From Swiss-Prot:
Gene source species: Homo sapiens
Residue ranges of the region described as Necessary for interaction with NXF1: 1-213
Record keywords: Cytoplasm, Methylation, mRNA processing, Nucleus, Phosphoprotein, RNA-binding
Protein name per UniProt: Cleavage and polyadenylation specificity factor subunit 6
Function: Component of the cleavage factor Im (CFIm) complex that functions as an activator of the pre-mRNA 3'-end cleavage and polyadenylation processing required for the maturation of pre-mRNA into functional mRNAs. CFIm contributes to the recruitment of multiprotein complexes on specific sequences on the pre-mRNA 3'-end, so called cleavage and polyadenylation signals (pA signals). Most pre-mRNAs contain multiple pA signals, resulting in alternative cleavage and polyadenylation (APA) producing mRNAs with variable 3'-end formation. (Microbial infection) Binds HIV-1 capsid-nucleocapsid (HIV-1 CA-NC) complexes and might thereby promote the integration of the virus in the nucleus of dividing cells (in vitro).
Region Necessary for nuclear paraspeckles localization, residue ranges: 81-161
Position of sequence motif GAR: 202-206
């Protein structure tokens, strides 16, 4: 704003507001636009989660100007005194607090605002209450701590930064202790006396249209607990998945619903009605179900028996479902829960799973008479504990047979391999006979053994023709071995030269096979050239004949 411009009337008490800020340091957390953005008391709080107050009121005895009017009553310009009321349960609502204050004879309540968790919108257990006179504030500080609100005595303090930080620390400790102890949120105990409040009236619940006394952030009650009562003469709507079972400890949430962080709260007492239940598929804005008409409804599979008095411990088993009901009470023997129908359980007769094993991944059930196979033991087909066969690739005949069985050969490939085996057999026999006649029995024996192993490793070794070749090579090998046993000196010499000659023979064999292939291709190429030459000669003769005829 430029200098020299006169201030309008709205800023007449700016200095007074600055004095209030100097006296009270809690204005650090004030957002000046929250009063404009946030809805009025008749519409409930703003839907977004806030970790602090919308507005912090001035201290005791200060007058408020037009710009700092309270959120609830915009026309009020008189004295306004703010107090903190803490040590409340997280399900305490504005209506509960209003009832307690009115019961003390204090009727000048200007504002009630609860502090909420930013993460889930749940109450932190303390609220700001604004009243219009010092007498009312003193009466609240003296008498309200003596009243019991949901099993706890409220704590009333002046509105300043010190007590605000104390309440914040207490709410954090409560949240952490509730999470460490693993206590689930079983839902607040609903009150039938508060069910008569009109929806959309002055009381501001955490959700618009919620039944007073209900959950500020309705979490699913466990499998136990019948639904709360309905107004007389009203037909109860049929829940999507059936009514809940008998009262019991809190259980897992229904599918598709998020459970807010658990907070430590007083357990359900026997003199209070059970908590309201939010069924799956029911939006948060709708009120919880009221009392059902007299008479138990038919049981619906999936959520246990119909509501009513708790069944005896020795009663009939409940119908099967994804969440079997627990016994009615925190004490009692734990029930063995069967796995859901869509998950395989451990096989019958098998030992129970170890604590670290996920039962969802057990093998499917097998016949109880057959031994169950373990991952560390032999397969059930081998009673002697031998390892299962494996594919050895190119290292032996069994692997080759398996390979042949897996990939059938074409006729051309089969004939090519058979021709190669025949060539190996004939050349090995001829060379072995020549080496044996020269007295080199070791080289002859090695040649025959090598040929036999090559034929056995081929892809067609299981064929009868290959077996005939192998038997002929083996007969030749036996004959040469019998001859070699009669000549000891020759055998000694052959042993000395065995190693060197074997290398030479293998090289010679490779070179000969290559030469044969080269000769074969050369011969083919020569034949092609001859055919081409003949075709050219024929074409030339035809051309000459044509030329001769044209003349």
């Amino acid at each position: 704003m430029a200098d020299g411009v006169d201030h309008i009337d709205i800023y007449a008490d700016v200095g007074e507001e600055f004095n209030q800020e100097a006296e009270y340091g809690g204005h650090d957390q004030i957002d000046l636009y929250d009063d404009v953005i946030s809805p009025s008391a008749n519409n409930g709080d703003a839907p977004e989660d806030r970790d602090y107050m919308d507005t912090l009121p001035p201290t005791v005895g200060d007058d408020v100007g037009k710009g700092a009017a309270p959120n609830v009553v915009y026309t009020y310009t008189g004295k306004r005194i703010a107090l903190y009321i803490g040590n409340l349960t997280w399900w305490t609502t504005d209506e509960d607090l209003t009832e307690a204050v009115h019961s003390l004879g204090v009727n000048d309540i200007l504002e009630i605002k609860f502090f909420e968790n930013r993460a889930n919108g749940q109450s932190k257990g303390f609220a700001l209450v604004g009243v219009g006179s010092e007498a009312s504030s003193k009466k609240l500080m003296d008498l309200l701590p003596k009243r019991e609100l949901h099993g706890q005595n409220p704590v009333v303090t002046p509105c300043n930064k010190q007590f605000l930080s104390q309440f914040e620390m207490q709410s954090r400790k409560t949240t952490q202790s509730g999470q460490m102890s693993g206590e689930g949120k079983a839902g607040p105990p609903g009150g039938s006396s508060r069910a008569a409040f009109p929806q959309g009236g002055r009381g501001r619940g955490r959700f618009p249209g919620a039944v007073p006394g209900g959950d500020r952030f309705p979490g699913p009650a466990g499998p136990g607990g019948p639904p709360p009562p309905f107004p007389a003469g009203q037909t109860p709507p049929r829940p999507p998945l059936g009514p809940p079972g008998p009262p019991g400890p809190p259980g897992p949430p229904p599918p598709g619903q998020v459970l807010p962080p658990p907070l430590a709260g007083p357990p359900n007492r026997g003199d209070r009605p059970p908590p309201p239940v939010l069924f799956p598929g029911q939006p948060f804005g709708q009120p919880p179900l009221g009392p059902l008409p007299p008479g138990p409804p038919p049981p619906v599979p999936g959520y246990g028996p119909p509501p009513g008095p708790p069944p005896p411990q020795q009663g009939p088993p409940p119908p099967p479902g994804p969440f079997p009901p627990r016994p009615p009470g925190p004490l009692g023997p734990p029930l063995t829960l069967a796995p859901p129908p869509h998950l395989p359980g451990p096989p019958p007769g098998a030992p129970p799973p170890a604590p670290h094993v996920n039962p969802a991944f057990f093998p499917p059930p097998t016949n109880s008479g057959m031994p169950t196979s373990d991952s560390r033991g032999p397969p059930p087909t081998d009673p002697y504990g031998r390892p299962p066969p494996y594919d050895r690739g190119d290292y032996g005949p069994p692997g080759r047979e398996m390979d042949t069985a897996r990939t059938p050969l074409s006729e051309a490939e089969f004939e090519e391999i058979m021709n190669r085996n025949r060539a190996i057999s004939s050349s090995a026999i001829s060379r072995a006979v020549s080496d044996a006649s020269a007295g080199d029995y070791g080289s002859a024996i090695e040649t025959l053994v090598t040929a036999i192993s090559l034929i056995k490793q081929s892809k067609v070794s299981a064929d009868d023709r290959c077996k005939v070749l192998i038997s002929s090579l083996q007969d030749c090998l036996h004959g040469i071995e019998s001859k070699s046993y009669g000549s000891g000196s020759r055998r000694e010499r052959s042993r000395e030269r065995d190693h060197s000659r074997s290398r030479e023979k293998s090289r010679r064999h490779k070179s000969r096979s290559r030469d044969r292939h080269d000769d074969y291709y050369r011969e083919r190429s020569r034949e092609r050239e001859r055919h081409r030459d003949r075709d050219r000669d024929r074409d030339r003769e035809r051309d000459r004949e044509r030329e001769y005829r044209h003349r």
